[in-house]
Structure formats: C-alpha cells, structure tokens
Amino acid sequence: GDSYRQFLDNGKTERECVIQSVEAAKKANYVDLKDLIKSNTPIKAGDKIYYTHMDKSIALFNIGTDDLDLGMNILGAHIDSPRIDVKQNPQYEDSNLVFWDTHYYGGIKKYHWVAMPLAIHGVVVKTDGTRININIGDTESDPVFCITDLLPHLGQEQMQKNATKVIEGEALDLLIGSRPVKDEEKEGVTKFINNLLEKEYGFVERDLLSAELEIVPAEIGRAHV
C-alpha cells in the first residue's frame, strides 16, 4: 500500500534503502552491533541487533536461546536498484551541451531510459574528506535531467533495429545542461554547470572523481486500479 510506495520513492538506491531499513529497525527496538562492541555490551538471548556494511547492505539478528553451533535460521532479501551509474571524470561538452558519461547496471532495458525525467542520487566525497549526499531532480524546484533520443521523423532507421540495439549503451549519456556563461565563447556551458555545482551543491568537477552517483527515474510510485 502507501507505505510500500513511500519506501520505493525514498529508496531508489541501495544506500537509500539501507537508510530506511535502519530507521525501521530502530523503531522496532533493534540496536547497532557497532554500538554494542564499542560499549563492550554482551549479547544475550532476546536481543535484536542490526549491522550495516558500507551503508549498502544490512543484516538483522534476533538472538535466540540455543547455541549458535546448532545453526541459525536465515531469511535473505536482495536490494535491487535498476539504475545507470555515472563514471569517474564524466563531464564533457559537445555541440554546446554538457553531458555526463555513464555506464549502465545489469539487466536494464536501455530504451526505457531515454526521453524521460531522471534524477541524480548518491554521494560526493570532496578532496578534504567532506561527504555530500546528493539528490537532484526529485522535487519540483530541482532541475530535471534526461537521456536524449531521436525525434520520430528522424528515427526510421533506428526503429528497424532489434530492441537490444535501438538504444546502445554508449548513447546513455546524461544531458546535464545547455545554458552557457554569458559572453563565454569556449566551453561556456561547462563553466556555467561548474559554477552551479559549486554554488548550489557545494562541490566542484574534480570531486566527481571520488563520487558515487546514480541515475534513477525522477518519478513517484502510483497505485494501479
């Protein structure tokens, strides 16, 4: 129902799913294993414990009364996030348009991702070690991104291709912007984007080398009738 759609809307990446899972675990009285270790608190029967690894996976434990040598019951689930990943050093300008170079993850249908609103989620770690959480494109006041496609009257040859070839992986670069710095003749759009990133989001282009950014749909879940 509504709570499931809310989880999907707020959990478009592994990190975001883990954040929500930790919040739910705490509400259910689970405690962080790392905190128990720091405080030298012994684990006892009845304890409810969670552990996260690199902020991208989570394990929850209900401690029983039997010895662990007798085994344990395991219930596993997979956090799957269909997405397109931003490469390191991704930014380039072509024909007065700025793009970010990408590579796609796993089993996506590439033609699903063109000419639709997209958002950028992830983490940027600056050269001084500062960590910035990024979520651009999900709110109405945010800029919107897209992967370009051919117009219908220019795509007749394209439409004859097999579905796996209609959109090639190399064509999945993200359009970031087209507005140049005024009176700049060379890479004016790049300069505008760089100024915007620093002013609005607190990082510069070189910080993308140590970033983990993912392209996800900029839409919310809706109920089917």
Language model regions located:
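N-terminal hydrophobic/helix-forming segments and targeting peptides
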Residues: G1-R222
